[in-house]
Amino acid sequence: MRRPSAPRASALRALAHRASAVLAGTLLLAALAAPAAAPAAYAAPATAYAASAAAGDENFTIKDPRITESSGLAASRQHPGIYWTHNDSDDGPYLYAVDSRTGDTVARLTLTGIGTPRDVEAISIGPGNRIVVGDIGDNLDGTWPYVWIYELPEPRELKDATVKATQYEVTYADGARDAESLLVHPKTGRVYIIDKKEDGGHLYAGPEKLSVSGRNVFKPVAPIDLWATDAALSPDGQRLAVRGYFGGIDYDWNNGVPKRVARLNVPLQRQGESVTYSADGTKLMYGSEGESSDVQARDARGAAGKGSNSSSDGGSSTGAGKDGDGTSGGTVKVGAVALAVACAALFGVSRVRRRR
């Protein structure tokens, strides 16, 4: 990723916070490695699970050694069981199609017709099987006067190919900012972005239709109570899932003014960066960065018409912290110990930063 020569203090804080989150995630995973008895969480009906498993919508590992910073995830509706992903930065104009049944890459697309990507953070699929990619990251917290969105048709045949994409220039009505979450409404095709702020950000709505002439101004329409690393709309456009490093929030879409419903039981991962609904909407698939990164499936609210993997908070904007607790059932005790260790580590890191 290209960066200015003189980073600002706020930018350094943002990078330090991200490093702290990764450290905490590592400590949490280590602590949770110990076995713990836990009652079974909600399980979708067997018929729904069987169908989902047949499509590959279950846990898998991304095996491709070229994918070391999987920062976005999108389920293909045209190719069941296939998930599109990309690296965070310093990789080039590439998208990867991963078969969730095997973890193998079955296609790599090289995008043409665009500039050099800076910090690609998100991917989504809209109506007509149009892939939309968000080159919207800004680790220097508002350095770039504009960011980019790329749009391309999803190939009907999965193989390595060069695909021409359309590039859109994007600005924000209230100034430049960092963002890692992009979503496309599955019915209208309208593009939305959620900015990434530690104390919570906003949902930004783009124009009804993006334009290649001039800049597309995204406007804030609703607050999001999360330090968001990714978000996804359900295939029917009725639900919004937003995740952070250690938790997430389940919203009703509510015609573009999201209404908080519950906390999401987000799995603990090395560096939780991505989320997408499975093509049939019964699963939420959570991805992580790193070599051989894992993608973990959880039942989505309303899976097969029953149940939820969310913890209701009555629509509250608080609950167990802005990121949620990411725990459930018998894992709470072990998670509490892990969280204490992680908090101690984060406290130490913050003290070191203050002394500097």
Predicted regions and their residues:
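Sequence/structural signature of beta-propeller domains
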Residues: R2-A21, G25-R356
